Amino acid sequence: MLKGYSFFRDEAGEVWKIETPDLILRLSTADDISDFYKWEYNTETIRYFSICENQSMEEVWRDFVHRTEDPSSVNFTIVNKTTGEKLGRAMLADLIRGWKVEIFRIYIADTSNRGRGYGKQSMLALMQLIFEEYGCERLYLDHYTGNPARKLYDSLGFHFEGTLRANCRKNGVLHDVELLSMLKPEYSSLYLNGK
């Protein structure tokens, strides 16, 4: 367990909340949908995501329900531990415990809350959950080329696997994405072996 990070489990033993030094990542609920809608309506929040501009509340609701019902998907809301303010969202997809998972979407919505280490703490919490709790061997993510979050991913030890050309469509425009990954031995070497 990383210092300052804790898991909280439900009666079935599943992790429903992760605490970091400054944040709580908790399973998303229907009460979060209006925040997701507001955040994902903001062009700055969705700049580097394949989220269509001007999506309706109904579309956000349908996506939430679909992902909540999908056993290969886990959705977290990122909350300031001190103030209780909702800060952002993290979504896992393609989860096959013991093998692989994708960080499908992660963001801190309000630009005034960026640059405070919240993204790093959120990523570390997810990495710990993925490798130590879910027992995954592979974690991967992709991002639009030019996304400034690439610096964070590099600093955490992710490896560049290549560019997927014209892989995502947003508002009718095709975008290249860069594929990054981390394997369990790499995570262990960086975060569990005293380094």
Language model: regions and residue ranges:
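Solvent-exposed beta-strand sheet faces enriched in polar/charged residues
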Residues: 79, 93, 140-142, 161
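Conserved acetyl-CoA-binding loop-helix of GNAT-fold acetyltransferases
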Residues: 108, 115-129, 150-155
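Conserved GNAT acetyl-CoA-binding A-motif
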Residues: 132-142
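A short, well-structured alpha-helix characteristic of acyl/acetyltransferase catalytic modules
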Residues: 1-62, 186-195
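Acetyl-CoA-dependent GNAT
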Residues: 30, 52-112, 129, 183-185
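Conserved beta-strand-loop-alpha-helix junction that forms the acyl-donor binding cleft
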Residues: 140-150, 167-170
